[in-house]
Amino acid sequence: MELVQIYECLCDVTRLRLLQVLAQGPLCVCHFQAILGEPQVKISKHLAYLRTRGLVEVERQGNWMVYALPAKPPRELRANLACLQDCARENPLFQRDLARLKKLAPKLAATGPAGCGCATC
């Protein structure tokens, strides 16, 4: 993947937020909705954008589509995600996302990234 393509993917705040959360582990769309507070259609659109460019992978688990970072992400993506994690520590929006993810952690530990049983799924 070319560096320009990666930066095209990273130039949107929603995609940055998705990647930051995905850096913590795989999730389904309903989890992203709960964490980011954005509508399903917006999240799905951005996940599709990232997927077609190879920055996220998707796997069907029963009724759920579970998104994750690639098993072997490009070097440029790894470097930019490390920078994002570092910079996000001082950004209230990214901190809120991580706090919401932390609240979901017990549920995720019990059910995994798919099978949350929410009304959305």
What are these model-derived regions, one by one?
Residues 52, 71-121:
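C-terminal regulatory/oligomerization modules of transcriptional regulators
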Residues 2-42, 48, 64-73:
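N-terminal helix-turn-helix DNA-binding core of bacterial DNA-binding proteins
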Residues 38-45, 58, 99, 103, ...:
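Compositionally biased, low-hydrophobicity segments enriched in charged and small polar residues
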Residues 20-24, 55, 106:
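Hydrophobic alpha-helical membrane-insertion segments
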Residues 25, 37, 54, 62, ...:
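Residue-identity detector for glycine
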Residues 52-61, 68-69:
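Beta-hairpin "wing" of winged helix-turn-helix
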